[in-house]
């Protein structure tokens, strides 16, 4: 048995665009919300709408392994902020044109294989191609593994924003998406057949 079969590299993941309300997306979002309930005692209260993750306003991706096409093992999305979507309390923190990462998740059976970094790299690359200049995200102090990923990927802490801006334990990060400013994991993209 080859080690690449047992532990696929991030380069082996194939990303495809999916609707936020696609059944496979919903399965992952539900699993993520359950994770939040276990770690924080409740689901994420950040309001999201499926249309925020549809081009050109954003993007939602599912990642498949080559030996399991059509069966997602990870996901993530980003939504673009404009002046109308930035709450007055977040002015000066968020900028028009920022891409906000939301709903990043790797199936527990496929963790510790670099897939979270691959999802993050693909979200960065797609946001940059869509003209976003910066990527922002929020995590919490009960997710040290997420914080470690973002710091290792070159993200810098910024003041808290969003519904948790005034709560202790809200950790927010940003990274510029200037041309060539981040190393993306090599990824093969599956052809999009809608969805």
Task: For each feature predicted by the language model, list its residue ranges.
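Residues forming the Rossmann-fold NAD(P)(H) cofactor-binding site
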Residues: 113, 117, 121
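Conserved GNAT acetyl-CoA-binding A-motif
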Residues: 120, 127-139
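Conserved catalytic-core motifs of GNAT/GCN5-like acyltransferases
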Residues: 20, 136-141, 147, 151-172
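Accessory recognition modules or surfaces
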Residues: 117, 169-178
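Active-site acidic-Proline motif in GNAT/NAT acetyltransferases
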Residues: 107-109, 113, 141
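Acetyl-CoA-dependent GNAT
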Residues: 10-102, 107-108, 120-122, 126, ...
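Charged, amphipathic alpha-helical coiled-coil/dimerization segments
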Residues: 113, 125, 134-136, 151
């Amino acid at each position: 048995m080859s080690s690449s079969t047992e532990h696929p590299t991030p380069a082996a993941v194939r990303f495809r665009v999916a609707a936020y309300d696609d059944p496979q997306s919903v399965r992952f979002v539900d699993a993520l919300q359950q994770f939040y309930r276990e770690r924080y005692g409740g689901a994420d209260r950040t309001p999201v709408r499926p249309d925020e993750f549809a081009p050109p306003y954003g993007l939602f991706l599912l990642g498949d392994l080559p030996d399991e096409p059509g069966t997602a093992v990870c996901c993530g999305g980003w939504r673009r902020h404009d002046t109308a979507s930035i709450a007055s309390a977040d002015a000066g923190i968020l900028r028009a044109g920022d891409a906000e990462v939301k709903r990043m998740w790797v199936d527990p059976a496929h963790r510790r294989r670099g897939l979270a970094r691959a999802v993050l790299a693909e979200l960065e690359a797609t946001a940059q191609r869509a003209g976003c200049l910066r990527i922002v995200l929020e995590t919490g102090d009960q997710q040290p593994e997420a914080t470690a990923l973002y710091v290792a990927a070159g993200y810098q802490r910024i003041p808290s924003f969003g519904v948790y801006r005034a709560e202790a334990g809200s950790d927010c990060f940003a990274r510029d998406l200037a041309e060539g400013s981040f190393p993306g994991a090599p990824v093969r993209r599956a052809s999009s057949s809608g969805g």
